[in-house]
């Protein structure tokens, strides 16, 4: 009986210690928050640009279909209209692979922009060959020449080209907003023959880039921002 009581007391003590430790553990936060970053309250029409990344047929009728691609495309259409309305520059980014390559083959229909999201005459087109929209392109030069300080980044895929572009943008001096529902990704195979669901990967990718590099909003929240 004494042994049972001693065991119970030890168990209760361990539980109490665990609860005390949990209470003392800081709530999860981001490096941006710890660094004092504040939510964006408005957009400057002269200093903000919209990047529209890789809305190409490969992700819709090709080898890498994106489950939520159409939803993201429709929200990006709204962002493009918003940018045009406020005379913000819009940059359409496309990925091109070798003409005989397996993905985004140059000259193929899979490398073409989706028919429902095409650049207009006033939009600029950037062609890249890596996940980042900055590597091997003159995007940074064009943005700086236009006086751009802030980027709204939409596109495919969230964990790859959207994230890579955001991560490269910040060291170049830009602030970044990612409208989360204007981006999307696909199910991903892992090294141990498992599958990471696209919704799980989407959330993890956004959380990863939001820690340091980007402010995450919805499309509705971006469209509701005052423009000056």
Task: Indicate residue ranges for each PLM-predicted region.
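Active-site-adjacent betaalpha module
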Residues: 21-49, 77-81, 86, 98, ...
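Bacterial N-terminal signal peptides
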Residues: 8-17
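…and closely analogous acidic/polar surface helices at protein-protein or active-site interfaces
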Residues: 64-83
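Surface-exposed patches in mature extracellular/periplasmic domains of secreted proteins
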Residues: 92-93, 155
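Short acidic, Gly/Ser-rich segments with clustered Asp/Glu that frequently serve as metal-coordination loops
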Residues: 58-61
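Bacterial N-terminal signal peptides that target proteins for export
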Residues: 1-8
